[in-house]
Regions:
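A short beta-strand motif that forms part of the nucleic acid-binding face
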Residues: 29, 100, 130-132
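Core segments of small alpha/beta cavity-forming domains
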Residues: 29-74
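Short Cys/His-rich zinc-binding micro-motifs
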Residues: 2-19
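Conserved hydrophobic/aromatic beta-strand scaffold that supports enzyme active sites
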Residues: 5, 95, 114-116
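Surface-exposed, charged secondary-structure patches
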Residues: 73-110
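Cysteine-rich micro-motifs
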Residues: 20-29
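Generic structural detector for well-ordered beta-strands
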Residues: 7, 82, 116-118
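Short beta-strand edge/turn micro-motifs at domain boundaries
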Residues: 112-132
Length: 132
């Protein structure tokens, strides 16, 4: 069991809003269980960036847009994820607007994106996104 708080920052639904552990949040997705919705997949992908899990990032990228290789920014320190909106756009499509904060070489930056997702055979995939 991994009692570490999940990097995605999701909290429990109870009034105290306690941080969920990796095992209770993104861990099942990383272990191969399908994400229940696009927001959960987005959160699990963020956690994969934090953990440096390139195989997971690539496996959850839709085959129509997936790069052959992916190199993560060396020395990046991920600082947090904010989900601004999760919108269902069709029976098997959704969008997630998020802000991911990180620091590289002492410089803080943020990625504000509207990402598109598609569900195929019961699994959600990241397709692409627009930087906002």
């Amino acid at each position: 069991m991994n009692p570490t708080p999940c990097p995605c920052g999701r909290t429990s639904a109870n009034p105290q809003g306690q941080a969920l552990t990796f095992d209770a949040c993104c861990g099942p997705c990383h272990a191969g269980i399908a994400a229940p919705d696009a927001e959960s997949l987005m959160r699990s992908r963020y956690s994969a960036f934090v953990c440096g899990d390139i195989p997971y990032i690539l496996a959850t990228w839709h085959s129509s847009q997936r790069p052959v290789n992916l190199a993560l920014e060396a020395g990046a320190k991920w600082l947090g994820l904010s989900i601004k909106q999760h919108r269902i756009t069709g029976q098997d499509t959704a969008e997630v607007e998020f802000i991911a904060r990180f620091r590289v070489g002492g410089k803080a930056t943020r990625q504000h994106e509207l990402s598109r997702f598609v569900r195929e055979d019961g699994r959600w995939f990241y397709v692409d996104g627009d930087v906002l």
